[in-house]
Amino acid sequence: MPEAWAPVRPETPPAPELLYWNAELADELGLDAGQTDKGELARLFSGADIPEGAQPIAQAYAGHQFGGLSPSLGDGRALLLGEVTDRNGQRRDIALKGSGQTPFSRRGDGKAAVGPMLRELIVGEAMQALGIPTTRALAVTTTGEPVYRERPLPGAVLTRVAASHLRVGTFQYFAIRGETAMLNKLADYTIARHYPQLAGRDGRHLALLAAVAERQAALIARWMHAGFIHGVMNTDNMALSGETIDYGPCAFMDAHYPGTVFSSIDHQGRYAYGNQPAIAQWNLARFAETLLPLISPDDPAAAVPAATEIVEGFEDLYQRRWLEQARRKLGLEGERDDDQALADDWLMLLAAHGVDHTLAWRYLADEAEGKGERLAALFPSPDALTPWLKQWHARHVPRTRRPPDIAAAMRRESPLYIPRNHLVEEALDAASERGDMGPTLKLLEALHQPFAERDGLDRYAQPAAAELAEGYRTFCGT
C-alpha cells in the first residue's frame, strides 16, 4: 500500500556502538548473530548500513492527541526496516527509532537520546516478563553524536520489534481523506495480519471492530493489574495487534491511587491510571468511525447502531477480563456475584491508605498461609485491614486447595519486581551520564523473573522513599 508510507533513508551516525543486544529476542526471531562482529551489528541497527534488499519506509497515520485531532502525523523519527518471520511462524516488524528525519518529521530532528531508548527497553522487557503483550527492543545503539534537548544528550537508536505498526491512527489517516478504497485494503491487510480467522467473511469489518475491542480489553486489564500507566494513550498509540506500543512517558504506580499521573504533558490528567479503560473505549469509538463506510458501504449511517453496540460493550468486556485476573490474584475458587465488590473494596482500601499497589497484591499471598506480617506492615494500623480480611477469608470457605498451594498460585499472578521509577531513573542516569550499563543490566536481571522472589534483590522490590516519589514526572523524550 504505497499510499500509506514514504521511502526514507536513515541518517548515518558518525560512530555507532552497540550498547545493548537482546540475544533472547534475536533467537526468537531466528536471527543468528553469534558470529557477527559487534561493530557490524552496531552499523546495521543504527541505520548506518541497510540490509541487502531492504527498502526502509516511514508510515503515515493521523491521531487524536489528548483529544484533539491531528490529521497528519506519521513516523517522525522512526522507520520500518523490514519484516521477519519468527520461529513460531509469526511475521514481525523490525523498526528503527531515532534514526533521523523522515517526510513526517515536521520540525523535529528525528533523533533520540540514550535515556528514552533505554526506558523503552527496560519497560518493554518488564511487560514481556509480566505476560503483557508488548513491542520489544532488539538493540540499543549509541550514535556517537549528541542530540539537543534542554541540554546536549548522547544520541541513540532503538531497534523495535512489533507484531505490526498498524494503529487506530493508520485508519484515521485515510478515513479523514475519504479514501474508502484504501481503507478497504487496509482493513483486509489488518485482518490477514492479525485476525486471519475473519478473512473473507461477510460482516468481517464489524467483526474486526469486535476483535480489536476484545484484545484491547484484555490488554488494558493487564495494565491495570500491573499498575502500569501508559501516559500518552493517543489513537496513534493504540496498536491494532493488541500490543503495548510507545513507552515515552510511561511509568508504574507505587502507592495505589486512581488519579496517578506521571506524564509532564498530561496537565489535565486525561491519561491518569484510573482513566485508562475509558480512554481505550474512546479510542475504540474513533476506530469504529473509520470502519462505518466498510461495514455499510451504501449507507454508512446504517452501521452506527451495530458499531455503537460493540463500543458500548467494551466496558463489560474489560470488566470481565479484569475480574478474571482479580479472582486469580485474590486466590478465589469459582465465581460468586459479590467477587467484584470484594475486589473493588480491596482497591479502595489501598487508595484510602496510600498502600503500595504491587506489594499489597504480592503480600496478600502471605496471608493465605497465615503469615500476614508483611501485608499488615504496609498499613498505618492493623485495624485498617481487619474488616476486609474477614470478608476475604470468608470467601475462601469452603476451599479445595491447601493454603500453600493457594499462596503459590497467587504469587504467580502478582509480581514482586516491577520497573520502579527510581530504579529506572538510576539506570538511565548511569548509562546517559557515565556510560555505565551496570544498573540497567542488574535491573533487567530482576525484571526478567518478576514473580520469583530471590536473595539479594530486596532493593528491586521496594518503592522509592517518599521524598523521591513525590512529584515524580516522566517525559516523552522527543
Curated annotation (Swiss-Prot):
It catalyses: L-seryl-[protein] + ATP = 3-O-(5'-adenylyl)-L-seryl-[protein] + diphosphate; L-threonyl-[protein] + ATP = 3-O-(5'-adenylyl)-L-threonyl-[protein] + diphosphate; L-tyrosyl-[protein] + ATP = O-(5'-adenylyl)-L-tyrosyl-[protein] + diphosphate; L-histidyl-[protein] + UTP = N(tele)-(5'-uridylyl)-L-histidyl-[protein] + diphosphate. InterPro entries: SelO (IPR003846). ATP binds at residues 74, 76-77, 97, 109-110, 160, 167, 246. Its cofactor is Mg(2+); Mn(2+). It comes from the Bacteria. Keywords: ATP-binding, Magnesium, Manganese, Metal-binding, Nucleotide-binding, Nucleotidyltransferase, Transferase. Its EC number is 2.7.7.-, 2.7.7.108. Mg(2+) binds at residues 237, 246. GO terms for molecular function: AMPylase activity; ATP binding; magnesium ion binding. The active site is at residue 236. Belongs to the SELO family. PANTHER family: PROTEIN ADENYLYLTRANSFERASE SELO, MITOCHONDRIAL. Nucleotidyltransferase involved in the post-translational modification of proteins. It can catalyze the addition of adenosine monophosphate (AMP) or uridine monophosphate (UMP) to a protein, resulting in modifications known as AMPylation and UMPylation. This is Protein nucleotidyltransferase YdiU. It comes from Chromobacterium violaceum (strain ATCC 12472 / DSM 30191 / JCM 1249 / CCUG 213 / NBRC 12614 / NCIMB 9131 / NCTC 9757 / MK).
